[in-house]
């Protein structure tokens, strides 16, 4: 297994798919990285030469991925919460941030439903 950006990428898959195992690299970014590195998308990871691996590593190092990207996303969310913006308040309350309705759904964000005591007989 080759290690790129601190992540073991699978040997038996095509390089373009294997790079998507790195947080922050999807299929479009993976294709751009391989084009810039001059590596074919169809080649398997186990068939890469050392020079090709180094070229891919250089391209990936130029992009914010893994820990740096996670840290930036978390800092952005904390900043929104500190300035008291609508999005920050929604994050703080654990509600959907992007305008979804909460009357019926949003269970993923709100957590498990809590039963309310009904009318006693």
From Swiss-Prot:
**GO molecular function list:** rRNA binding; structural constituent of ribosome; tRNA binding
Extract the ranges annotated as region (Disordered).
94-121
| SUPFAM superfamilies, per the entry | S13-like H2TH domain
Q: Name one GO cellular component term.
A: small ribosomal subunit
Family, per the entry? Answer: Belongs to the universal ribosomal protein uS13 family.
Q: What is the role of this chain?
A: Located at the top of the head of the 30S subunit, it contacts several helices of the 16S rRNA. In the 70S ribosome it contacts the 23S rRNA (bridge B1a) and protein L5 of the 50S subunit (bridge B1b), connecting the 2 subunits; these bridges are implicated in subunit movement. Contacts the tRNAs in the A and P-sites.
Q: Which PANTHER family match?
A: 30S RIBOSOMAL PROTEIN S13/40S RIBOSOMAL PROTEIN S18 (PTHR10871), SMALL RIBOSOMAL SUBUNIT PROTEIN US13M (PTHR10871:SF1)
Q: How does it assemble?
A: Part of the 30S ribosomal subunit. Forms a loose heterodimer with protein S19. Forms two bridges to the 50S subunit in the 70S ribosome.
Listed name of the protein: Small ribosomal subunit protein uS13
Q: Which organism is it from?
A: Streptococcus sanguinis (strain SK36)
């Amino acid at each position: 297994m080759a290690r790129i950006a601190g992540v073991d990428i699978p040997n038996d898959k095509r390089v373009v798919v294997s790079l998507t195992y790195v947080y922050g690299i999807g299929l479009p970014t993976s294709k751009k990285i391989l084009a810039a590195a001059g590596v074919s998308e169809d080649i398997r990871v186990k068939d890469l030469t050392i020079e090709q691996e180094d070229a891919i590593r250089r391209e990936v190092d130029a992009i914010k991925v893994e820990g740096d990207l996670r840290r930036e996303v978390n800092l952005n969310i904390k900043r929104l919460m500190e300035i008291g913006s609508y999005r920050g308040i929604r994050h703080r309350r654990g509600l959907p941030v992007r305008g979804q309705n909460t009357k019926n759904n949003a269970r993923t964000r709100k957590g498990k439903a809590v039963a309310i005591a009904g009318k006693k007989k």
